[in-house]
Every structure is written in structure tokens, then in C-alpha cells.
Amino acid sequence: MRTEALYIRPGQIEVNYLFENTTDNPITTAVFFPLPPISAVLDYYTDYLDATHQFRFKLWVNGKEQPYQTQFSLQQHGRPVPSFASKIWKYPEESLDEATFHQRFLALSPAERQTLIDGKYIYWGYMLVLNKQTGESGEQEGWLMSDRHDTLWEKQITYSWEQTFPPHKTITVRHTYTPSYKTINTGAPFSKCIEGNSPAYQLFSAPAAQGEKRLAAQNYLEYILTTAQNWQGPIGHFNLLIESPLKSVGCFDGGPFYAKQFYAINRPNYTPERDLSVDFLDNKSVLGYQPKYAPVLYRVNGPAKLRSTPHGKTLGQLENNTYIWGCPGKKQGKWIPVLQNQFSGYAHQKNLIQVF
């Protein structure tokens, strides 16, 4: 993989890849893109519950939209749930409430039902059932897949497609999807490397002005980076951009990050060893956030000067053949804003070559 550009914002994840086949022969292989495990219980999903495909996955190869396959498997705290249980779902991305699960479970064969009962994959208990006429919920007994603690079922969804890589040529692959979020009721971050009571987090989430509320972690997502280890060698140029309405925190490369509107990473010859997590901080849900401008990944044709303003003070130098994120929608004249963490400013468009 020559280049990867990963752009994460509330409501959408976009990934662009540039692949190169350096051999003398075409290579045809299956490409797999797994999502982080999610609960099979309805209320663990985002608020896109009525969508046929909540994740809205789309795939393009060399600019043309392509078909793909969707598979899923079920686990209960790390142990596989028998594969026949997947018949309970009509399609991989379907989410079920407990009452529907109970009805679908009863439609299994007696032997299949007994296997799940004997294996303690399910239990008999009380569920909340919505009365659609009154709008009120009441308790009802039935077979449950999870009590949120001891018998939680997780669903692992994977998208796949067959890809041919021509010899000595490059191809671009792009896919987008709506990630699954956890909504945080306590306001404490889910990311494991962020300590909510630490001085660093308390200072970062403090009110910006007197009378304002402290920022709280509202929505949490995960992204699997380590699948890149399946490709030959490291990623030539890995580029990450996280955009949030106000601030975000999370874990990258096993360490914490604290970011304002943008968090940008550019790593040459990168082999990810840990996955990524993000908590978006705000005083309300961020799922409706829509950015005004689309970011672009550039390769520097330089060296190029980075200025505080167009024609302003020189802040530093962008080295030749390095990669940076920019926002051409906000350019002033021929000067494009650079969206790096501690190295932001303006660069002249003549020194920037668009990659994705």
C-alpha cells in the first residue's frame, strides 16, 4: 500500500488508498474491511435505526462504484456463537430489539434452540416491550440474548470484494460509511488511554468562558487500523485527519491525543500495531455535524514555506515529498490553509499536489 488517507468526522468515515503492484504479474485477491464489533442489541446502535443499512457502506475503485459482499459473525465475550444463530437476522446489518429476537429465536428448530439454551448463550428473563398504540413500554418475559453484562452478544460485520491489481500499475480504492457510535450518558470518555479525572483531561474539557458548561464526551467510535498489516510491508504514507465541531480526545498508537477542531497525523513507512478510538467532546450530540469544507490530502512539491497568513510571517518549512492535509475551500487567493496539529498556517497552491 503506497498511501492511505483516513478522514474521520461525526457521521462519516472516508478512507482512500493508493495500491501499487510491483510484480510482473497481475494479482487477484479478496480484500476484507472489518468494522469494530458492535452489540447485537438495538439500543447500542446509532440513531440511524430505520435505515436498511445503517452503515451505508459504499465502495469505489478508480473512481467507479463497485459491488461488495457483507458477512457477519456472532461472539459472546470472545467465544463464537453457533453459526446457525445468524439466521435470526434477515441481513447482516439488521439490528433487533429484544422482543423481535425472542420471536425469531422461537422460529429456530427445537435442536437449535436447545443448543443455545444448553450453551448458556441466552437466558430467560424480562424485557421491555413497546406498545405501539399507547407509546408506553411494559415488561414481558422471554428469551434474551443479553443482560448487558454476562451474556452480551457482539456482531462482527465485514465488507469484502475481489480485487485485481495489474502489474506495475497503481489503483485507487475509496470507501465511505457511517460508523456505529456509543452515546455517552456519563460524559466520561470511553477511550482507554484517556483518564477522565486526570489534570490534562480536566483542563482540556474546562469551560472556555465564565458561565459556559464543561465539555463532556458525547459520542465514541472505534476504527480498526491493524488490518493494514495484511498488506506487503508498511504503509508508504499513512495520513489521518479527525474533525470535530469543538474538540476530541482519543487513543492513537496506544497513546492519548487531545485535539481541537482538527487532529492530523502523517506517518511515513507506518505499520499500525494498535487500533484507534475517538471521543467527541461537546455539550450536545455531535451526530448531526456537517463540515462546511472538505479537507484534501496534498503532497508537498517543495520545500514550501508555511506562513501565518497569506504573504505573512514564515512559521516554518514543509519538506519536499511530505504529506499534509489542507482545506482548499477556505483558501485565500492562491494560499491554502494547512490543517496540521502544531504546524498550521498557509501554503501556496503551487507547492501542493493533490493526492486524494
Please give the residue ranges for each predicted region:
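A short, compositionally biased
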Residues: L49-R56, R299-G302, K331-K334
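Core beta-strand residues in small-molecule sensory/regulatory alpha/beta domains
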Residues: W60, K305-T309
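Short alpha-helix capping/helix-loop boundary micro-motifs
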Residues: I157-T158, S308-K313
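Short, surface-exposed secondary-structure edge patches
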Residues: E162, G312-Q317
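SH3/SH3-like beta-barrel superfamily modules
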Residues: Q317-N351
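Short, solvent-exposed mixed-charge patches
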Residues: V355-F356
